[in-house]
């Protein structure tokens, strides 16, 4: 399927071929991530961020500006007419009339699909509900591909909140297009939702569930860490106990492969020790930086085509 005028709502909407085309385009865009092109001159991107965002919003805006386009929109509900009671539908209709593409983040699951059903321009989901963040998953997979030159035949560990972190669902769905082994590590209370486990089983994915990083550390090529969210725990004492056991430190990586890379969608709190920032394992800052060329490629493909 062509990328031109395509909505980007869910990781499930994209094939392996789609993703590889995006990755090669993003690799080319790395050459221009600090310069300006005129590919999207005259195009306007509207950002509708009903939830706070730093990296996702700014990388989309930077990508559009680097491509020669312009940006309008808002970064919080308070900065929009939603604060006055305007409906999501009316907001989308207004942005649709002003722009060539809409990038939306919302707390409600299905908000991006709802926006796409209303809008006449393409809509990109920058995160909605607790289960969808397709462009973050694209960035994560792209970072792994840039590091290893492939996604097939890698063992990827995902550590932390596997139940509520929306990027986890999107990343697993996206990785189902490749021959990977998944090792999912979390406290019992934050195990993946049944729907995600059923999806992995249906797709015939090689996966296993674990409660301790040590069980799988030596086989990992990638360790993807997501924040454990305090607000999900009814008992603060239980949170403190669990949080401490899922912190990645130099000491906890004894026995890891020399080639292991650590990724994190950011922001981090204390789940990845800052002492790791200068080690050979750390790739999370490069991962964040690659968000600009990845989203440049995405915008170019959707607005200009192959």
Curated annotation (Swiss-Prot):
InterPro entries: Asp/Orn_carbamoyltranf_P-bd, Asp/Orn_carbamoylTrfase, Asp/Orn_carbamoylTrfase_sf, Asp_carbamoyltransf, Asp_carbamoyltransf_Asp/Orn-bd
Residues involved in L-aspartate binding: 84, 166, 227
E.C. code: 2.1.3.2
Binding positions (carbamoyl phosphate): 55-56, 105, 133, 136, 266-267
Pathway membership, UniProt: Pyrimidine metabolism; UMP biosynthesis via de novo pathway; (S)-dihydroorotate from bicarbonate: step 2/3
Organism superkingdom: Archaea
Enzyme type, top EC level: transferase
GO biological process, one term: 'de novo' UMP biosynthetic process
Catalytic activity field: carbamoyl phosphate + L-aspartate = N-carbamoyl-L-aspartate + phosphate + H(+)
Transmembrane segments: none
Molecular functions (GO terms): amino acid binding; aspartate carbamoyltransferase activity
Keywords: Pyrimidine biosynthesis, Transferase
NCBIfam families according to UniProt: asp_carb_tr (TIGR00670), PRK00856.1 (NF002032)
Family: Belongs to the aspartate/ornithine carbamoyltransferase superfamily. ATCase family.
Function statement: Catalyzes the condensation of carbamoyl phosphate and aspartate to form carbamoyl aspartate and inorganic phosphate, the committed step in the de novo pyrimidine nucleotide biosynthesis pathway.
Subunit structure: Heterooligomer of catalytic and regulatory chains.
Name listed for the protein in its UniProt record: Aspartate carbamoyltransferase catalytic subunit
Source organism per UniProt: Caldivirga maquilingensis (strain ATCC 700844 / DSM 13496 / JCM 10307 / IC-167)
């Amino acid at each position: 399927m062509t990328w031109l005028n395509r909505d980007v709502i869910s990781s499930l909407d994209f094939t392996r071929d789609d993703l590889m085309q995006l990755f090669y385009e993003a690799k080319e865009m790395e050459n221009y991530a600090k310069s300006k092109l005129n590919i999207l001159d005259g195009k306007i991107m509207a950002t509708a961020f009903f939830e706070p965002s730093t990296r996702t919003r700014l990388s989309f805006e930077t990508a559009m500006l680097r491509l020669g386009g312009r940006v309008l929109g808002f970064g919080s509900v308070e900065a929009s007419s939603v604060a006055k009671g305007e409906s999501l539908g009316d907001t989308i209709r207004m942005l649709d009339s002003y722009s060539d593409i809409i990038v939306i983040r919302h707390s409600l699951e299905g908000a991006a699909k709802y926006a796409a059903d209303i809008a006449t321009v393409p809509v990109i989901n920058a995160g909605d509900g607790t289960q969808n963040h397709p462009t973050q998953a694209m960035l994560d997979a792209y970072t792994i591909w840039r590091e290893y030159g492939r996604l097939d035949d890698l063992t990827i560990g995902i550590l932390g909140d596997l139940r509520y972190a929306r990027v986890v669902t999107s990343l697993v769905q996206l990785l189902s297009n490749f021959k990977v082994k998944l090792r999912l590590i979390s406290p019992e209370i934050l195990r993946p939702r049944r729907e995600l486990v059923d999806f992995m089983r249906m797709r015939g994915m090689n996966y296993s569930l674990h409660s301790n990083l040590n069980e799988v550390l030596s086989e990992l090529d990638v360790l993807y860490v997501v924040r454990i969210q305090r607000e999900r725990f009814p008992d603060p004492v239980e949170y403190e106990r669990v949080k401490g056991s899922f912190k990645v430190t130099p000491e906890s990586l004894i026995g890891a492969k020399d080639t292991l890379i650590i990724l994190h969608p950011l922001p981090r709190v204390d789940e990845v020790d800052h002492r790791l920032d200068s080690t050979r394992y750390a790739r999370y800052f490069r991962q964040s930086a690659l968000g600009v060329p990845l989203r440049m490629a995405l915008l170019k493909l959707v607005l200009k085509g192959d």
